[in-house]
Every structure is written in structure tokens, then in C-alpha cells.
Amino acid sequence: MVRAVLFDFDGVLADSERLHYEALVHALKEMGLNLSWEEFKQGCIGVPEWDAVQWALKRNGVNDNELVAEVLRRKTQIYDSWLTERLKVADKMADVIRALAQNFVLAIASGSFRHQIEAVLLREGVLELFPVIVSCKDYEQGKPDPTPFLLAMERLNEFISPPLKPHECLVVEDSPAGIQAARKAGMLCVAVRSYYDDEALKDADFIVDDLKGLLMPKLWEHFQMTPLL
């Protein structure tokens, strides 16, 4: 029985991957470097911020951790300056979250920075519905390693009784790396269509068109989930 829903953030709750890409390219161009959208999809979605920047630099033939830190600092600065005005959330995001919170405990396990996640959730009025937020500073091994999701479950278990088990957690993801992480954690997984085709999402238990698909009766029947009140 599903008792908890663990969300990725970028591409699931927020339509933010394009903004991340634009900010990264802006920072790279200041260094005389570049990255295509297809390259970004290949190596930068669903992974921690440091790993994404490191991958982008290696793609440009650069292997320098000091430069990774500098590009990440600049990319974060640019992204944060755009956050309030340009970042859009998934359609009906707040409504979906409030509906799910009636029956399940919720958490976020993301490769983004905590302040970026909290700023958006606060803006949308749902921050208090996520007792646990795991961000890129909370772990060393990011997705596709299962650590982010297992850590989110562990932190939920600090105030849930009986403790959650992996098979009682439903992960909502949009990237192959995130789906792999959920699988390795022994958790169920729903994939939201965003920037990848269904072939790339095939290892998920269920695929939905958008976040609103989490409220479909067909999905609830598939996972034998408790009906909404």
C-alpha cells in the first residue's frame, strides 16, 4: 500500500529545466564555452547541480573542479535572478499537491538547491505540505544513485509510525536517471512526460501526460492506492 509520495522537483513540480539550461549556457558563454539543449538533456537533467556543471565542462573538454565551482556559482546567480518572474510551475500543481496531501505524506528529493525549491513552494502556498525536502547539499551520490530517495524516506520516518518501507513509497519523476534511482531504492515510480519520449521512461511503472495525471482513477487502481477523501 502506498503511504508516501516522493517528488522530483525540476520537470515535475516546476517547468524549470529550460530555465536551468538557459542559465547554464549563459554562464558557459561567459567562459567562451557552450552546450546544446540535446547535450543538456543527455547529461544534465535529473542529476545534482555540481554533476551537471561538471558534465557540461567535460563536454567542452575542460576538467577543472575550480572552474566547475565558478560556473556553478555564476549559473546559480543567474537562475536565482530569474526565479521569481520567469519560473512557471506545472499546471494545477498546488491543487494536485493539496489533494494528495489528504491521503499521503509528501517529500521532495531533488538535485536542485533548497532555497530554489522552497522559494517556489512558498510562492505557490504549498511549502508546509512537504515536511521533508532533500536537496543537492544533503547527499554526495545523486541520481541515478538511490540515495536521495532513501534519504527522503529516512527523514520521513523520523515522525511516521510505523516506519515507511521502500515499496510503500511512490516516486514521481521525469528523467531516466530519476527513474533508475527509484528502481534501485525499491520504490514504485510514475513518470511524467516532459522532455523525454516514452522509450526513455519505459522503466517506470506508469506514465502520465502531466502532473494532473496523478489524480487519475486508473493510476490509483494500478497502485491500489487509497481513494481521495
Residue ranges of model-derived segments:
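Anion (oxyanion) recognition and catalysis
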Residues: K29, L100-A101, R183
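An amphipathic alpha-helix signature
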Residues: Y21, V25, E49-Q54, R114
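A metal-dependent, Asp-based hydrolase signature
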Residues: I45-S81
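Short, surface-exposed acidic
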Residues: L33-K41, G61-V71, E128-L129, S161-P166
